């Protein structure tokens, strides 16, 4: 069974260590999620324009109500303008 859903997504860019021990790379196609296992691939789609990106979970968060994903700056920019800050997305856990 494929896990899918909708939620808010934002982006972050600090150059800290991620929860799995990697140095955060704002240009990598990665994301933070509260519970998905590290290295899980997730397809994230912006329903407003149909653009999608596949990211790898390597961090924990976001810690803002209503949001389930924090995308790297590069991943967010692939599906929406950075000026928006956060958007509603559809997601599909690929494994």
Task: Enumerate the predicted regions with their spans.
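Secreted/periplasmic proteins
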Residues: 1-95
């Amino acid at each position: 069974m494929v896990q899918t859903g909708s939620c808010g997504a934002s982006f972050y860019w600090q150059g800290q260590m991620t929860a799995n021990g990697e140095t955060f790379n704002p240009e990598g196609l990665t994301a933070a999620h509260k519970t998905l296992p590290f290295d899980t691939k997730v397809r994230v789609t912006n329903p407003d324009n149909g653009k999608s990106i596949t990211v790898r979970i390597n961090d924990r968060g976001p810690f803002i109500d209503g949001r389930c994903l924090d995308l790297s700056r590069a991943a967010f920019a692939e599906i929406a303008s950075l000026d928006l800050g956060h958007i509603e997305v559809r997601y599909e856990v690929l494994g």
